[in-house]
Every structure is written in C-alpha cells, then in structure tokens.
Amino acid sequence: MSAAADVPRRVTIHDLQLRKRQHRRWAMLTCYDALTARIFEEAGIDVLLVGDSAANTVLGYPDTLGVDVDELLILNRAVARAAQRALVVADLPFGSYQISPRQALQTAIRFVKRAGVQAVKFEGGRRVAEHVRTVVEAGIPVMAHIGFTPQSVHALGGYRVQGRGDDAAAIRDDALALQEAGAFAIVLELVPAGLAAELTAALQIPTIGIGAGPDCDAQVLVWTDMAGLTPQPTPKFVKRYADLRTVLHDAARAFAADVADGRYPDAAHSY
C-alpha cells in the first residue's frame, strides 16, 4: 500500500455545504502552529482558521491591525504543513486586500501558493463583494466575515454588537451580497441571536457564529480563549473548556523550583 493511501481525505468546502443541508453542525478553531494543528485535527476539528488574531495571541500586538502578510505567512505554512484532514483557512490581514479586487487576488494567491492553505477569509460586506467574486473566479475559496469586523474596530466605535434595530437590514444585505459573490461560508460575529438564526435559514451557504447565538451552522472560537489561556475577562460568548493558563503557570513554577533546589535533573533524567 502506498503512503498516499494512508493520508486522510481533507475536508472540502462542499463537505461543509452538504452538512448545512443535512443540519449537521461543525466546529472551527483558530490555530497558529503545527503542534496545535495536529492536536485539533485529532480532536475532530474540521476547519482551522489561521486568524489575524495571532497578532494579539502570538505576536504581542494590541489589536489585529498591525500584523502583516509576511508574519501570517509563516504561521499559515506551519499549520498547513501539519494539517492533513482539516480545511485550512488563511485570514488575510488588514491592508492586504481592501484597496482593490486585484490586490485581494494577489494576496490570496500568495497564501495559497506560499503557505499551502485551501481557502482565505476576509472581512466586510457589500463593499468587498467584488473582491470576493474576483478571488473565487480565480479558483480560490473565500470565507466571508460580517457583523463585528475587528479590522474595522475604529470605524465601528469599538467592540460592540452589530445588527440591532434598523442596522439589521444592512447585515442582511451584506450576507446576501457575499453569497451571490461566491463566498462558501460567512462568519457572523457579535450579531443578535435572532438575526443570526434568520440569516442561517435564509442563506444556502453555512453560517459560522462567534457571539451569534446557537442557531448558526457552525461555531468558531479563538483557541486560547476556548482553552482558558487568555487572561480574564473574556467576552460573554466565550466558554472556557479548560484552564491552561493555570496549568502552564503551575508547571513552569514547579520546574523553576526544582531547578533552584537541585531536584532537576535527577538520576532518572540523566544519562
């Protein structure tokens, strides 16, 4: 049997769209390195998003606006090399696609060719519909992102729920425009649960919720939030499934104490 026969079949955008029709929900996590990519795959995570949230969680920026293409390419390469089954999606950073559809295509091509990802994601509604169309027509799947869009945090007046009251119509129009442009899925961030449910029922493509209630076709979290590595407080929508911050703190503290007291390395850990 060839080695290729042992490689698991990769999740595709068509698989995700089929799951919507079958009412089968799925999970996406952010991921920034090879080790966690392998762990998340083994745990059954279907989509790995190499998010621009790496700016905060990995690279120490105060927000997502400062990270650039070259920095994210390194992280995308690591995840794409490790992931054999999960669909890997590259989050395009601020300033790398907004100028024109041509710029969006050029950046998307860089991530597909140089990092080996299977799809790209960028933020915005109707204003980026032509960008989506151009990239999709070139053969690169695009995941859209509407509602609260972190790259527009200053224009939106800070981190707050989008689509309440009269603003709901604009969110609906954005979603329909992006679907028509060819997006294979849409992230709904900080959108009222009722509106997210309405959009999920109306759209033919999957919706991915983050702070958008329980009725989306899928859910996504930043993995450091999900695993309890991020300092508290975290947003209301975050459920902490572990307390890795305490685990790592205690492990590092114990290591330092063992070294200081001469307990490590002992005979069992020496050659």
UniProtKB/Swiss-Prot annotation:
Binds 1 Mg(2+) ion per subunit. It catalyses: 3-methyl-2-oxobutanoate + (6R)-5,10-methylene-5,6,7,8-tetrahydrofolate + H2O = 2-dehydropantoate + (6S)-5,6,7,8-tetrahydrofolate. One of its GO terms (biological process) is pantothenate biosynthetic process. The keyword Secreted does not apply. It holds the Pfam family Pantoate_transf. The keyword Translocase does not apply. The active site is at residue 189. Its cofactor is Mg(2+). It comes from the Bacteria. It is an enzyme of class 2 (transferase). InterPro entries: Pantoate_hydroxy_MeTrfase (IPR003700), Pyrv/PenolPyrv_kinase-like_dom (IPR015813), Pyrv_kinase-like_dom_sf (IPR040442). This is 3-methyl-2-oxobutanoate hydroxymethyltransferase.
